[in-house]
């Protein structure tokens, strides 16, 4: 859906963790993306890191087909070569997060959207061998696109201020490896 909006020229930019293969795009690397196995606080996971057998015991919640998060999660699960319990498929990271909070299952999710829930002890990171998965958040746009003055100013601002924004806003990322 994100890529389709870009392709249809409905948006100037898209934020992705996996580069599209069907479009010619330019990009700017923004921030490391770390994906962890997360669950609510009902069950304790103190004796990790856990091996792949844990994955076959947990009901898993997936993003929709085409989602970068889903692609990364499925690739990881395929490498683990264990059967999994597919509980739900939802259309946004926020929906997945709320389902996990409600105790409907577990998921492999990007750290970027979990800060408040981790601080408030509504979610926990489950230590797992092979995690976190690390990718890169990238801002992409169609190659050769003629940007509006506002879009040009936005790109210029990001190029100039990227390091400062990361330092001031995402320093907490470093706590999680």
Residue ranges of predicted features:
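Secondary-structure junction motif
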Residues: 45-46, 59-80, 147-151, 155-156, ...
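Thr-Gly-centered strand-to-loop micro-motif
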Residues: 62-64, 86, 109
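Short beta-strand-centered segments that line the small-molecule binding cleft or hinge
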Residues: 1-35, 39, 46-49, 101-104, ...
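Well-formed, non-transmembrane alpha-helical positions, independent of function
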Residues: 4-5, 29, 53-54, 76, ...
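Short helix-initiation/N-cap motifs at beta->coil->alpha
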Residues: 1-3, 89-96
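Short secondary-structure boundary segments
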Residues: 18-19, 41, 111-113, 129-130, ...
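Hydrophobic/proline-rich hinge and linker segments of small-molecule sensing/allosteric domains
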Residues: 26-65, 134-146, 158-163
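Short beta-strand-to-loop elements that line the ligand-binding cleft
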Residues: 17-18, 83-92
């Amino acid at each position: 859906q994100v890529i389709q909006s870009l392709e249809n020229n409905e948006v100037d930019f898209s934020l992705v963790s996996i580069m599209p293969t069907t479009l010619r795009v330019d990009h700017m690397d923004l921030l490391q993306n770390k994906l962890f196995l997360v669950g609510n606080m009902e069950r304790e996971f103190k004796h990790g890191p856990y091996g792949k057998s844990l994955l076959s015991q947990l009901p898993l919640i997936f993003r929709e087909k085409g989602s970068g998060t889903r692609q990364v999660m499925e690739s990881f699960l395929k490498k683990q070569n264990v059967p999994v319990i597919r509980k739900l498929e939802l259309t946004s990271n926020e929906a997945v997060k709320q389902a996990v909070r409600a105790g409907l299952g577990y998921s492999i999710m990007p750290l970027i959207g979990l800060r408040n829930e981790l601080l408030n002890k509504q979610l926990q990171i489950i230590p797992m061998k092979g995690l976190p998965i690390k990718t890169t958040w990238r801002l992409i746009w169609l190659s050769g696109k003629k940007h509006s003055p506002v879009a040009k100013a936005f790109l210029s601002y990001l190029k100039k201020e990227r390091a400062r924004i990361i330092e001031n806003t995402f320093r907490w990322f470093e706590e999680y490896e």
